[in-house]
Amino acid sequence: MTSPRPFRFAVQAHVGPGAPIPTTAREFREMARRTEALGYSTLCVGDHYIDRGRITQYLAPLSALGVAAGATTTLRLGGRVFCVDYHVPAVLAKEMATLDLLSDGRVELGLGAGWNPVEYEAMGLTFHDAPQRVAKMVEVLGLLRAHFSGEELDVHGVHATAAGYIGLPLPVQRPHPPIMIGGGRKRVLSIAAREADIVSFANVPVIAIDDQGRTPHQVARERLGWVQAAAGDRFASLDIEASPYFLSITDDPTSAVDAVSKRFNAPPDIVLD
C-alpha cells in the first residue's frame, strides 16, 4: 500500500488582463511574502512575452524568481514552464542550478515544448512541428540532468549539445530539483510519467469537448490512465498537478456553479462533475 502524496496549492503569478500587476520590486516582494504567509507551497512564474496575439508582457521568470527567493524563506519557486526554444539549454541548466543553490533548494523546474506560434513569430523563432519540439524538450531534459550530475558533460544531441566541462554549481536538491512536465496529449503525458517528478494536466475542460460528449471528469480519468500506464512502478512517487484556470473561492458554491455554467453554456451537473 502506497502512502498518500501531500496535497499542495500553488500560485501562478500572471501579469495580464484582469490580473493584479506588481509594478514595483516592493509590490512583487510583498506578493511573494503574502503567498508564503497564506500557506501556499509554490509561487510559479510563466515564461511568456506576449499572449495570444495581445501585447501582454509577463515578468521574466528567472529574474522574478530570484527576487521571490530573496523575499521568502520556505516558499518554493516554480518556472511554469520554461520553453526550451526560448533558452540556450546549457545556460538554462546553470541558471536553474544557481537559483536552487541560492534559494537553499526551493526550485521546481517546469519544462515545456512551446505552444504559441504567435509568440514564436513575434520573437523571430521558427515554430517547428510538435514532434520536433517535443524531441527537443526530451534532449534538453537529458542535458539538464547531465549538468546536475556533477560529472563532465558529454551531450551531443540533434537539438541540445554541451560537452567538455563539469556543470557547476550543483543544485542543493539531489539528484536535481523536481522536474515538471505537463500536457494534454498522450505522447507528452507519457513522457512526463516516465521522466518527470511532477505531471501536470493542461487545460482540463469545463465542458464536454468532443463528439463523444465526454465530461471533464472522463477526460481527466483518461489522461490519468495514460500516466499510470507509462509510469509503471514510479507512479506512486509522482505529484499530479492540475490547473483550475477558472477558480472561485467562495462560501456560496451554488452561485459559483451558476456563474461558470452561464459563462461556458454548460449544464450545472457537468460543472459539478
Q: PLM features: what roles do these ranges have?
A:
Residues 1-273:
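Active-site-adjacent structural elements that line small-molecule/cofactor binding pockets in enzymes
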